[in-house]
């Protein structure tokens, strides 16, 4: 039989245990867990696979947290106090219902991994200081509603992994070419037709690099290069011919491809009542 939540809290306090795992316990409110916010010593808190809809401001009491995992809940909003977690390195908010991030979210000074996969976020959801998260090494934004990736992405120069799969992206900013430490770029399942020539600044064709771009309505010359392989795509977008064609394409300001309607089937779109039946 699994230990009660009360017992987990008591044990963590008595034995000074740094990690608390409360995953898959049917928890709908963190304030119901007696004593949780007195565990200021803990460095890791796992609350994945629960039924949380909000995170209380008290989260700031857990000031030594380095890992915070809320994967697969029903969280619709976060408190501004979350950004006071000065030691937080790894924050997993994947599979929730977020459509906005709180003001000041970008002032997490130690954050290295941020997972926002499978929410309802878009370019207007990000607070002004989001791209101050310059310590980020991995940013997961897949399965959201981004049509545009803000040019400030270029400020996240330590990024090694950027996942943008299954959004509604119609273009990538030239600033993506400033992410010279990038080892993985996932842009499959969007509405992209062209790539900025600046992407050619990156080395994503080696054996240890990953570049995934299928299921996009590429213009014919790029689609042809993909048939030959990723290294051919990068060679092509670095060419003067492509730079000229890209310039003309952008000037013509073509109508973006239509949205894919499959996205409305996302679980995070459904009303809560329907999901819990």
Swiss-Prot record:
Keywords for the protein's UniProt record, in alphabetical order: Acetylation, Leucine-rich repeat, Repeat
Region (Disordered): 1-23, 250-277
Biased composition (Basic and acidic residues): 7-23, 256-265
One Gene Ontology CC term in the entry: PML body
Residues modified to N-acetylserine: 2
Cytoplasm found in the keyword field: no
Annotated LRR repeat ranges: 41-63, 64-85, 87-109, 110-133, 135-156, 158-179, 181-202
Chain's role: Potentially plays a role in the Ras signal transduction pathway. Capable of suppressing v-Ras transformation in vitro.
PANTHER family linked to this entry: PTHR48051, RAS SUPPRESSOR PROTEIN 1
Protein name: Ras suppressor protein 1
Gene, per the UniProt record: RSU1
């Amino acid at each position: 039989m699994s230990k009660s939540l009360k017992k987990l809290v008591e044990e963590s306090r008595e034995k000074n245990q740094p990690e608390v795992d409360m995953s898959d316990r049917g928890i709908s409110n963190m304030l119901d867990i007696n004593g949780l916010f007195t565990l200021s010593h803990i460095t890791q808190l796992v609350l994945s696979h629960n039924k949380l809809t909000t995170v209380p401001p008290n989260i700031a009491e857990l000031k030594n947290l380095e890992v915070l995992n809320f994967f697969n809940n029903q969280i619709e909003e976060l408190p501004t106090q979350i950004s006071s977690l000065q030691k937080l390195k790894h924050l997993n908010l994947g599979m929730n219902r977020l459509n906005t991030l709180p003001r000041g979210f970008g002032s997490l000074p130690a954050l290295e991994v941020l997972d926002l996969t499978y929410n309802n976020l878009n370019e207007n959801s990000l607070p002004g200081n989001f791209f101050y998260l310059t310590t980020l090494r991995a940013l997961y934004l897949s399965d959201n509603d981004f049509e545009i990736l803000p040019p400030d992405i270029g400020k996240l120069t330590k990024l090694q992994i950027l996942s943008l799969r299954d959004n509604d992206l119609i273009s990538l900013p030239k600033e993506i070419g400033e992410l010279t430490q990038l080892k993985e770029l996932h842009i499959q399942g969007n509405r992209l037709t062209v790539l900025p020539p600046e992407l050619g600044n990156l080395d994503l064709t080696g054996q240890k690099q990953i570049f995934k771009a299928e299921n996009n309505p590429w213009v014919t010359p790029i689609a042809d290069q993909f048939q030959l392989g990723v290294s051919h795509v990068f060679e092509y977008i670095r060419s003067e011919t492509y730079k000229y064609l890209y310039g003309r394409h952008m000037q013509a300001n073509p109508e973006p491809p239509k949205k894919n309607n499959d996205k409305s089937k996302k679980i995070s779109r459904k009303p809560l009542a329907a999901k819990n039946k």
